[in-house]
Design a protein with these regions (language model features):
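N-terminal amphipathic alpha-helix/helix-capping segment at the start of soluble metabolic enzymes
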Residues: 4-6, 14-44
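Conserved anion-binding
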Residues: 27-28, 91-153
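Hydrophobic faces of well-ordered beta-strands that scaffold small-molecule active sites
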Residues: 31-35, 57-59, 83-87, 111-113, ...
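Short, acidic/polar
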Residues: 38-49, 93-101
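Catalytic domains of carbohydrate-active enzymes, especially glycoside hydrolases
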Residues: 49-58
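Surface-exposed amphipathic alpha-helices with a cationic face
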Residues: 51, 72-77, 124-130
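Metabolite-binding pocket within alpha/beta catalytic cores that recognizes anionic/polar moieties
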Residues: 58-110
């Protein structure tokens, strides 16, 4: 029994090592730190504090509404960091296309859109041949519970 458990543990550890090798992503690139603050100084203070231990940051509505696109520019141009722009975009085709072109110009690495097919098509069209930003399509917000979903139909 103990030997079987040891073999199972060894097999699991080997599988985990193989999985880690398959990913081959450094730890600092696996973590995305949310800059869920409302001012540029606080956001950049956190980036400075974390230094080279983190390479990926999430910017969203709160920081964008208070600091504009400056955090993205600072992260990309001055700090050489990766940016996940969590905007959950959903708009008419032309607006999405133009927004995605702007994301490409800014060098955004990941962007979120809402989960409808027209938005996804427009996002892909706007991104063009660029491999970035990666597009994450949100089908529903995780802050909704079962009652909320039933109420929505």
């Amino acid at each position: 029994m103990v030997m079987a458990m040891a073999e199972d543990l060894s097999t699991a550890q080997n599988r985990e090592k193989q999985h880690d090798m398959d990913l081959d992503i450094p730890a600092k690139d696996r973590l995305i730190v949310a800059l869920d603050v409302n001012n540029l100084d606080e956001a950049m203070g956190l980036v400075n504090e974390l230094g080279d231990t983190v390479s990926f940051y999430k910017d969203g509505f709160e920081l964008m509404l208070h600091a504009g696109l400056e955090p993205v520019r600072m992260l990309k141009l001055h700090r050489r960091k990766n940016v996940f722009f969590d905007l959950k975009m959903d708009d008419v085709k032309e607006t999405i296309i133009k927004a995605m072109r702007g994301m490409v110009e800014l060098g955004v690495d990941i962007v979120t859109i809402h989960g409808n097919g027209d938005t996804a098509k427009a996002a892909l069209e706007g991104r063009g041949t660029s491999p970035r930003p990666k597009i994450v399509q949100i089908t529903y917000l995780t802050s909704l519970d079962g009652d909320d979903l039933r109420d929505l139909g």
